[in-house]
């Protein structure tokens, strides 16, 4: 699902949940897209120009989520939970930590070791060549 279509679906789901509708999780796979969050300076983290990326079919989107720069692409399952944190007595920080714990436990089921870094939000995994990858949670407040 293209990122902008998923974003529109999230906005619609959010409006329904705020109006008292059922909480839900949207599960999607995006074509190649790089999103920038509200944190300034994300462009510095690109290793190619936006022109080079768009020429290769990578969409560039400025989003309203928190954070910096994120790539989504084929083969990645992206989960967008649309929930009422207050109804579950959760703060944003507590919710993020519970997501991290859930991801670590899920990775264990597949024989993958994931860990948290107190200095950086997200779950870190090491590949067979020793490279680290981050699984970041994103949030949007209403």
PLM regions and their residue ranges:
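N-terminal lobe of the biotin/lipoate ligase/transferase fold
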Residues: 1-134
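Short, intrinsically disordered, charge-balanced linker/junction segments flanking boundaries
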Residues: 135-142
